[in-house]
Amino acid sequence: MYTSGRYLVQFDPYTERHYIKNIAKRHSDRQWQATRKSIEFVLEHIEKHILTDKAETIHVSDAGRIIKLYFKIAGTKDSAKRSSNRAVVFLNDKLCVARVLLIYSKEEICDPNETARWQKIVDDQFPEIMRKFSSR
C-alpha cells in the first residue's frame, strides 16, 4: 500500500485562506516561506519521516492515510513537537499525493480538545476525504 516514491504536495485552498494566513501574520514572510519549503520537503519524502517523531499516522484505509505532521517555524528555537505547530495531511498512496488539509498552531484550536477540534474541522470541510475513513 505504501510507496517509496516522492509525493506531490498540494496545499488545500481552505488551509491557505484560514490557518496559513494566521501563522504567516505572526512571522516574517521569509520565515514562513522557509517553513513552507521545509514542510513540502518532508511531505515529498514522508515515508522516511513517518518513522520518526515528526509525523504520526492517524487513520488508514485502502484510499490512503491521514497523518499529523509536527513542524517548527524556521528561525525559532523550539523542536517541531514542542512548537505546537501541526499539519493534517491526506496521503493518497496510489497517486503519491500529499494534500495538506490543515496547518495550525495548537494555540488556535486547542480548546477543549485539539484532536476533537481538528477532526471536526476536517469532517466539516473535507467530507469527501473523511468518507474514505468512515469505519473509524
Locate predicted features:
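A short, surface-exposed loop/turn module that caps and links secondary-structure elements
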Residues: 45-77
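Alpha-helical interaction segments
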Residues: 9, 22, 60-61, 107-108, ...
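Residue-level signal for alpha-helical context at structural boundaries
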Residues: 33-37, 57, 106
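Arg/Lys-rich, positively charged N-terminal/basic patches that mediate binding to nucleic acids
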Residues: 1-43, 130-136
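A general secondary-structure signal for short beta-strands and their flanking turns/coil
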Residues: 4, 64-66, 84
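Short alpha-helix boundary/capping elements
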Residues: 43, 47, 93-96
